[in-house]
Amino acid sequence: MEFCVLFGGASFEHEISIVSAIALKEALKGRIKYFIFLDENHHFYLIEESNMHSKYFAQIKEKKLPPLILTCNGLLKNSFLGAKIIELPLVINLVHGGDGEDGKLASLLEFYRIAFIGPGIEASVLSYNKYLTKLYAKDLGVKALDHVLLNEKNRANALNLIGFNFPFIIKPSNAGSSLGVSVVKEEKELIYALDGAFEYSKEILIEPFIQGVKEYNLAGCKIKKDFCFSYVEEPNKQEFLDFKQKYLDFSRNKAPKANLSNALEEQLKENFKKLYNDLFDGALIRCDFFVIENEVYLNEINPIPGSLANYLFDDFKTTLENLAQSLPKTPKIQIKNSYLLQIQKNK
């Protein structure tokens, strides 16, 4: 089976998406037919596999390529010999953050009837906004930490709105990859932390920070009626897993497996199933959990995890191919114009 990897995007996580695509090239050797790059101006470019390395993008060489036009079932490439349709194999949406995870690309791909692996429109909207994610989890009976939602209008009253003691953690509501996230240990650190978070989002979440909390990551997808899970990862971290720890450490290809009981692993999987069904059908996602006093809490849902979390699976290729065979199908609406014909007939 062949794939097309779509990456880039107008997002704070643009470069992370490039790194993910390069990593996926290695994980799916020989299976990726096309690499389609989406730049910050929403132009699509076809990137040769030989150019899928950091130096190429650091030098912005893709700007010399002819842009492509998205159309039904593929991409349109103009040349001196006329327009040519590039028919796309199954697309993997690997655009992190804005464009890829907020629903824009899901809408575009669905509109043009281009099959893809990734979160659909509703799943994107709910998981991209951390506040909505908490409401969604609560409705499903999945626990989440207490929180306060701040915006520019009420930020001046932040200390009065926060109902828990220092330290607490501040994070943008609409950003991933630990961008804009900071731990506030005392009042004098608050303004700087708020300024940093508001650079990435119009709304921010504030949660109690619990020192030494156990954190577990679990990736997976649903293939037909059965779930396929990765192994459980316990990230090596200091206070929290920051941007550098997530993306600038290339010293290992595999994440550390968690040492946990069978009972706890089963709890994580049951919570994952609640969050996945049926909203995320067709996507491979990662759920990040906290365990506090033997209770499982959702930290966040990552609808397009970095490098598609391939490093957490023992057989990633087979998992992805099986998922590709069980994507949800949207029924095509047949337009018969029977109502209009009846009106015309009665005239």
From Swiss-Prot:
What are the names of the required cofactors? Answer: Mg(2+); Mn(2+)
Q: Which reaction does it catalyse?
A: 2 D-alanine + ATP = D-alanyl-D-alanine + ADP + phosphate + H(+)
Q: What is this protein called?
A: D-alanine--D-alanine ligase
Q: Which GO terms describe its molecular function?
A: ATP binding; D-alanine-D-alanine ligase activity; metal ion binding
Which residues are involved in binding Mg(2+) 2? E300, N302
Write out the GO biological process terms.
cell wall organization; peptidoglycan biosynthetic process; regulation of cell shape
Q: Which organism is it from?
A: Helicobacter pylori (strain Shi470)
Annotated S-S bridges: none
Q: Which GO terms describe its cellular component?
A: cytoplasm
Sorted alphabetically, the keyword list is: ATP-binding, Cell shape, Cell wall biogenesis/degradation, Cytoplasm, Ligase, Magnesium, Manganese, Metal-binding, Nucleotide-binding, Peptidoglycan synthesis
User: What Enzyme Commission number(s) appear in the record?
Assistant: 6.3.2.4
Cofactor binding annotation:
Binds 2 magnesium or manganese ions per subunit.
Cite the annotated pathway. Answer: Cell wall biogenesis; peptidoglycan biosynthesis
Instruction: List each copy of the ATP-grasp domain by range.
Output: 134-332
Q: Which family does it belong to?
A: Belongs to the D-alanine--D-alanine ligase family.
Q: What does this protein do?
A: Cell wall formation.
* Annotated positions binding ATP: 161-216
